[in-house]
Amino acid sequence: MLPRPLVPLAFAALLGVTAAAAAGPPPPANEVRGWLLRIHDAASHRNFQGTFVVSGGGSVASARISHFYEGPNQYERIESLDGRQRKVFRHNDVVHTVWPASHVAMIEQRGLLNSFPALLQAGDDGLGEWYEVQAEGLDRVAGHEANVLAVKARDGYRYGYRLWADHDSGLLLRVDVIGEHGDVLETSAFSDVSIGVRPQPESIMQGMRKLDGYRIVRPVLTPTRLDTEGWVLRRLAPGFREVSCVSRQIENPREASADPALPPVIQTIYSDGLTYVSVFIEPYRSDSHRQPMLASLGATLTLTQRQGDWWITVVGDTPPATLKMFAGALERKKP
């Protein structure tokens, strides 16, 4: 398991809920979208450094995170502290992922993938139909007083969340993903964090420039449509809609070379405004595609299956029913 800070930290500051609001009645459902937009804004406009830990499914992983902003510019560094060393540097939408041991660096533009923060601005006015939000008082996380908010799923197609946000700044300190039976599937939390630190953008830019001796990988992402690629999705899980569809030219950044003959993979991303489902479509290859499976790691489920001459992979932080609905609704268009 790897920390996924762009997802929990994009929630990233509890909606600007004040102490008075935390002690008051549950907020109206129509305020959900406004809260989430304030989360996104607070995540972008806090300078902080800390250690972030993700645990779930018997696995634990941690990363050191620094986030700075100056005017319109955002800077971020994420360094894994477990397993194979990996560093991620971000300046606005440009992301460099660096593997020091193999001297490989992957450079991509996050905006092309419509990552989670962008989804909050994509017109998700119906969030209150799918989630119920309740304030749950105060707690402490990583030495900081925090407001607690419960985001409860209204149906079986999505999970719920419990959020802890710093009382003074609104920065998200912890998020639990809550399963269908009320169990905690995954916890993402700061074990230590300093908020309001002096921004050091040059430390991020230096890391992005120091690539001498590295093999540079630049994934080729081409916007496309399912129907253009010969596919149709007959139905969507309730509340989900398509937010991105790209053709990805796959290259393994850990290998010294890649097979240029490998066909591109079609990736379509769907979201209900809080969570996401990714559908990958690629030609079936007997040497790499084995038995169909449904596997979980923390809150993330992965479903794979063969469909004729194609291999389908569906990934999401959702209950199995959601992934099965997407996989079952995907059909190859008739000539």
What are the roles of these predicted feature ranges?
Residues 115-127:
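Short, solvent-exposed helix-to-loop capping segments enriched in aromatics
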Residues 1-9:
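Bacterial N-terminal signal peptides that target proteins for export
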Residues 24-103, 129-178:
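N-terminal mature ectodomain segment of secretory-pathway/periplasmic proteins
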Residues 8-17:
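Bacterial N-terminal signal peptides
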Residues 19-23:
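Boundary at the C-terminal end of the N-terminal hydrophobic targeting segment
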Residues 212-308, 320-325:
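Short, solvent-exposed recognition patches
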Residues 97-118:
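Acidic/charged, solvent-exposed loop-and-adjacent secondary-structure segments enriched in E/D, K/R, S/T
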